[in-house]
Amino acid sequence: MGQSLFNLLYYVIMQNTILIFGYGYTGSYVAKLLSQKGWKFIGTSSSSSLTTETIIIIPYDREAITNVIKLATHILISIPPDENGDIVVGNFVDLLFLAKNLKWIGYLSSTAVYGNHDGALVSEESALRPSNERAKQRIRAEAQWLEFGKQHKISVNIFRLAGIYGPKRNALEQLRNGKAKSIFKAGHVFSRIHVEDIARVIVAAIKLGSVREIYNLADDKPCPTFEVNNLAAELLGVIPPPIVHIKDAELSEMATEFYNDNKRISNYKIKDKLHIALKYPTFREGLKAIYDWNYGDSI
């Protein structure tokens, strides 16, 4: 682990400590916000170089997790499920009983669980119509965590994320790397959300501490991908990628599945229950901010 268990205990004792299964892009933004409030972090990752003053990285294995699980007051799961559902439940559910101070569990799911609603507005109460196996796996994982929370009287929050974008993962990068595709399908839209707003919602949910909640995380403007690409091209001062009709597009299996589903994700609940005012209410504010931070002085 890079340091003794004694030092690890000293590091986290008497503090709110969140164990992030699958510490990566989204988890790093959650850590940034909570570290400002004095929280400590333990994350699983294959890259020990991610260890900093505020987060200790451990491998995703039984011995390492056994050593730290009892220190966790909160757990966030950011690992995709497999055919059996959530892999943390599958591999380590017995270890969760060692976490005597555990108050809250958050699971990062996906709006893919809703499947196709023919462009209709979808809330947390809408029917789940999974159209592919990955979405079905997400539903199984959600159910496993909600049942665990119910049985053991622990707060469990499910976060159904729309398409994630932010620094290093956005249409500007895709254009610069020649990977942007503008596909047209009549009436089809995607919902998305900036990673900073995801972190802000998660922190607000932790603060509220509701026993059993499901939240949609999306911004205010579902739209076709080509609208996002057009703005990115405008900011970069380049020609936008040509718009290709869906019937003429060469798409991967995963991309085809995305275009088979059409829905507009409602974010009313995070505004009403968590009092969230999105920092980036649409892709326009988000992309412009990313451009100003990362590209404005170099192009």
Predicted regions and their residues:
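Catalytic helix-loop patch of NAD(P)-dependent Rossmann-fold dehydrogenases
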Residues: D118-I158
